[in-house]
Structure formats: structure tokens, C-alpha cells
Amino acid sequence: MNVPAALPPCSILLLAGGRGQRMGGRDKGLIEWQGKALIEHLHRLTRPLTDDLIISCNRNIERYAHYADQLVQDDDADFNGPLAGIRAALPLARHKWLLVLPCDVPLVDEPLLQALREKAVECPERPIMVREGQHWQPLLCMIPIAHAATLEAAWQAGERSPRRALEPLQPVALQLEAGDPRLANLNTPCLLTGISENCGK
């Protein structure tokens, strides 16, 4: 496995759960983009970076199992959002850090993930979160698994927003420019089509 020794080993969580409301109820991770399922694009990117690849999913378990070392499912069938997947994965992570990615950002690249890990070396006790311009991207982050209990307590108190759950831990920003194309979120059919056309030019 080609993981630079200077960077902390990490477990990686791919978030593929959810209702897929903007996709007409389809399982977003399995929707094809440029001839491959979205989850396959993220698998190809992250597989060389970890020996603990976790996927959070609520359906099509057999298909997702092909891409993961571990699968996690929400303990609630109501699709309570990405924080549900994060809280389920943190106690199972085999490394001290959990790197989190949604399944609908296929343009994210290895330098971005490596930059997150480098920032984690600088600030080992705090979550690292991508900040695009003035906007936080809480689903592109690294979380020390030591904070699992804090996030669980936030969940039990009724919090469902990953950003608000992480706020008390004073996340450190990995600052990116507004409009960074790597952060394109392909969460509607129109966006999928538009990005595909632009990439083909």
C-alpha cells in the first residue's frame, strides 16, 4: 500500500446512505457517472490510502460490500442523515483518524486527501474540515476517533447536523478557494449531466 510514512494512517468512510431524494429516490452511490458508479470512483481514489475502507449504506448491501472492508448501517431506518453514518463508523474505525467523504464528489483528488492528512499532523487533537471560501464542507473532514463519545452525545441530544456536532471540537480549516472544481457535488441528475459534459470538453 502506497501510504507516505509521514502521514497518519487513517480509516476512510464513504457516505452512501440516504434517501436520494434529489435523485428521485435512487441509490446515489450506485448511479453511473462516466461509465462507473459514483462509489466506484471514490473506491478507486481511496483504496490505495487505507487498509480500513468503510462504507455507510442503507440498501444494496451486497453491492457495496464489494468495495469495502467494513459496512455500517444506521440503527434507524428513517435515513437520519450523514451524521448517523459517521457516528456508526467512528467506534469501528481501526485507526486513530476517520477521513470522511460523501459518495457524490467524484472529482475529489488524492492531493486534497493528502492535504487533509497533512493538516491532521499539525493539529492532531482536533477535527480537520474543508472550508471552501467562506463555507464549511463538514462532510469532507478528518475526525480523531477519540471524539466518538462527543459526537454520540450530540446525537443523543438530538443533533443531526455534522457541522454543529463538530463545532464544539473547534475544527481546523483546510482552506480552499471558493468554487474549487474538485468539490463539485453531483447530487442531482442535472448536475451529473452537466459535469459529465464539461469533463468531456
Swiss-Prot record:
Its cofactor is Mg(2+). Mg(2+) binds at residue 104. The keyword Transport does not apply. It is found in: Cytoplasm. InterPro entries: MobA-like_NTP_Trfase, Molybde_CF_guanTrfase, Nucleotide-diphossugar_trans. It catalyses: Mo-molybdopterin + GTP + H(+) = Mo-molybdopterin guanine dinucleotide + diphosphate. Its EC number is 2.7.7.77. SUPFAM superfamilies: Nucleotide-diphospho-sugar transferases. Its main location: cytoplasm. One of its GO terms (molecular function) is molybdenum cofactor guanylyltransferase activity. Keywords: Cytoplasm, GTP-binding, Magnesium, Metal-binding, Molybdenum cofactor biosynthesis, Nucleotide-binding, Transferase. One of its GO terms (biological process) is bis(molybdopterin guanine dinucleotide)molybdenum biosynthetic process. GTP binds at residues 15-17, 28, 74, 104. PANTHER family: MOLYBDENUM COFACTOR GUANYLYLTRANSFERASE. Monomer. This is Molybdenum cofactor guanylyltransferase.
